[in-house]
């Protein structure tokens, strides 16, 4: 993993930016004069469980321990962080390998249901053996909280702060955890929206955040709803729209799904009883 020294990043002097690289670009008014710009890095990341490669994802090369934990939880590979004995991030010849040591019980379960998913890039259909596995049932979520929509405004304003790479490249998605008082407990960014969410879910499990809601800078696909529900997230806010399958899954698993989140604006798709003004 490389850390790049940035002399000037859109008025940020002497900044340090991980997950971006410089490249020569041209603009219409200076086609013969190259200029330096910053691009978000995208690398293959292999998740390897007890020595067996399970999945390869395209991702930003940062916060990969959080990603491994979040992915393991959101895919039902583990039930709690205690099921993982160790995580080791290693550079490989063509990307990065994340070596994950699972408990014997969880690894046995993974081998039983293991499916061919090589090359998956966040698509929930890729590598699934049968169409019946799409939108698989998730245990219904309990109703344990009420969240004030007035607290969403501050979170939307602060979401950009999570995207350090995105601010200089325009090329990342963000996922943040909103505490009940509207402050951001933490957040993650990645070139892939599903990976950004998995990183957040990993951070949430590690930090023990319970009450509150997840906020993503992208649309809400069914897989993002399913991942959230698998991790016990009761409320998911998305800056863009939700798909019809995402709404169906959210309805079935009792997740409150809200899209088109802007200051003073929101579209509530499911279970509005968790929300207040």
UniProtKB/Swiss-Prot annotation:
This is Sulfur carrier protein FdhD. Keywords: Cytoplasm, Molybdenum cofactor biosynthesis. The lineage of its organism: Bacteria, Pseudomonadati, Pseudomonadota, Gammaproteobacteria, Enterobacterales. Belongs to the FdhD family. The active site is at residue 123. Required for formate dehydrogenase (FDH) activity. Acts as a sulfur carrier protein that transfers sulfur from IscS to the molybdenum cofactor prior to its insertion into FDH. SUPFAM superfamilies: Cytidine deaminase-like. The keyword Cytoplasm applies. GO terms for cellular component: cytoplasm. Coiled coil: none annotated. GO terms for molecular function: sulfur carrier activity; sulfurtransferase activity. It holds the Pfam family FdhD-NarQ. GO terms for biological process: Mo-molybdopterin cofactor biosynthetic process. It comes from Pectobacterium atrosepticum (strain SCRI 1043 / ATCC BAA-672) (Erwinia carotovora subsp. atroseptica).
